[in-house]
C-alpha cells in the first residue's frame, strides 16, 4: 500500500481525541503516513501557541513530501469543481489534493469535498474503519 497523506482535519480530530481519528495511532506506528509543508503550516502555529511541543515533535518527525504546484492544474481543478457544483474548495485544499495525486498517495481527510473530487481527478482517498 502507498503512503497516506494525512490532512489537517484528521490531525485536529486526532489531537481532540475524536473516535474516528484514533486509527491514526496504528498508521503512525506502521510508518504509513506522510505530510507536507502546507499541512504543517496549518497545524504547527496553533500547537506552538498552545505549548504542545510534544505534538509538534511528533509532526516534524513524519516524512514530508515536496509540494510542486502546477498552477495550471490547480486552475483546471477549480474550473472542474465549479462545473460540478463544488464552489467552496479553497486553494490550499486543491494544492493538497494535487500533491496527493502527484505523489500517488492516498489522502486521509474528514473534509467531504475531497470525496466529491476524487472521481474527476484520480484522487485516491484512504477509507478508515
What is the role of each PLM region?
Residues 65-106, 110:
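Active-site neighborhoods of divalent-metal-dependent phosphate/nucleic-acid chemistry enzymes
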Residues 11-12, 40-43, 114-115:
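A generic structural signal for short hydrophobic patches within well-formed alpha-helices
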Residues 6-7, 35-36, 89-90, 111, ...:
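Histidine- and aromatic-rich ligand-binding microenvironments
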Amino acid at each position: 500500500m502507498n503512503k497516506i497523506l494525512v490532512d489537517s482535519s484528521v490531525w485536529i480530530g486526532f489531537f481532540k481525541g475524536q473516535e474516528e481519528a484514533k486509527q491514526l495511532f496504528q498508521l503512525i506506528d506502521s510508518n504509513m503516513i506522510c505530510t507536507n509543508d502546507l499541512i504543517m503550516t496549518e497545524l504547527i502555529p496553533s500547537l506552538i501557541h498552545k505549548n504542545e511541543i510534544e505534538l509538534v515533535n511528533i509532526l516534524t518527525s513524519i516524512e514530508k513530501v515536496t509540494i510542486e504546484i502546477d498552477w495550471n492544474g490547480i486552475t483546471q481543478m477549480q474550473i472542474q469543481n465549479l462545473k460540478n457544483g463544488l464552489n467552496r474548495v479553497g486553494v490550499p485544499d486543491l494544492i493538497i489534493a494535487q500533491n496527493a495525486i502527484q505523489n500517488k498517495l492516498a489522502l486521509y481527510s474528514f473534509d467531504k469535498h475531497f470525496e466529491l473530487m476524487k472521481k474527476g481527478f484520480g484522487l485516491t482517498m484512504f477509507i478508515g474503519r
